[in-house]
Amino acid sequence: VKIRPAGLLDLARIEEMHRSADIRLSQAEPPAARLWSLLSSTLSAILPLSQETLMYVAEENGKVVGFIQASGQPLGLDLRRATVLQVLNLQVAEESDSEVVAPALVEHLSDQALERGALRLFVRLPERDPLLPAFRLRGFRQYATEVVVYADKPEPRSDRFPDGVRPVKRGDNRMLYQLYRKGTPQGVSQLEAPTYREWRALHGGEWTGRLAARGSDKQEYVVDRVEIVGWVKAERSTGARPDTLNFMALPEGPLPGELADYGLSLLKDSETPAWSSLRHYDSHMIDALRGRGFGVLLTQLLLVKELAIRVPVREKGLVPSFG
């Protein structure tokens, strides 16, 4: 198998493979699950070649039999400055051996990303995806599980809302970062956003698994009790997709349930289904939403490969000089 950069002449074949995979996925997944995958950069997304992406193809006997694509994060970041990349797509033609082609593509992408100065490669994969072994065999490890919950008609349980709830204002970002660090296992936050600056660059995007709001009809609130202990963002749908709820909350007493009810109140009178993307460590919010008509739509695995280990520079000691 020969791996090389994708060129314009490869696009027709790449699009053919992508359409074929699209048809198979559409038959296997509920429509809402497929829509979520398309919106959240789950493995199977594809960007035009002209955008800031790396794309490589696998060739056998002169024919393209697979391709892999990755982008900088946030999406569209100049690749010359990107230290974190996300794998958007990996596909192998049906007639080819995916156990040979897929790992070769993953390995080549890893090598090229490292040469460009990237520190980490991330990928979001549906549970039990047949391509999962290709990543595990090339050094990717799972660091989190993402759970997407969905309700055709969500039902609030109470009109009791959290004490201290108020609209987000300028200056809240640093306190929101502290909330993120408190509610996120250290092993995850150190990978995704070890500094406030990195968190700001990624906050609100698909990188953390929380669907980004794309419309203008969105509302954002925090629960302020000297420190911020909860956050909710509600976006009413402006098209075919469901309404979106995003949450961060400390697992304290009635707070998750009250925050869930408050989030649903922001969508009152909406006839549209709703969904929310949460992590395995957000079990308190998942349970709160389950009690309000939500069910698990799909589970996805978040994997990472460390391309380069950052080692702190040893400080030089000052040695007294005599004489």
Task: Describe every region a protein language model picked out.
Residues 27-55, 60, 191-218:
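Active-site rim helix/loop that mediates acceptor-substrate recognition in acyltransferases
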Residues 55-57, 63-72, 86, 222, ...:
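Conserved beta-strand in the GNAT
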Residues 113-126, 269-280:
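Conserved GNAT acetyl-CoA-binding A-motif
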Residues 73-87, 236-246, 297-298:
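A conserved beta-turn-beta hairpin within the catalytic core of GNAT-like acetyltransferases
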Residues 138-158, 271-323:
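Active-site/acyl-donor-binding loops of N-acyltransferases
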Residues 87-100, 244-256:
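A short, internal acetyl-CoA/4′-phosphopantetheine-binding micro-motif in the GNAT/acyltransferase core
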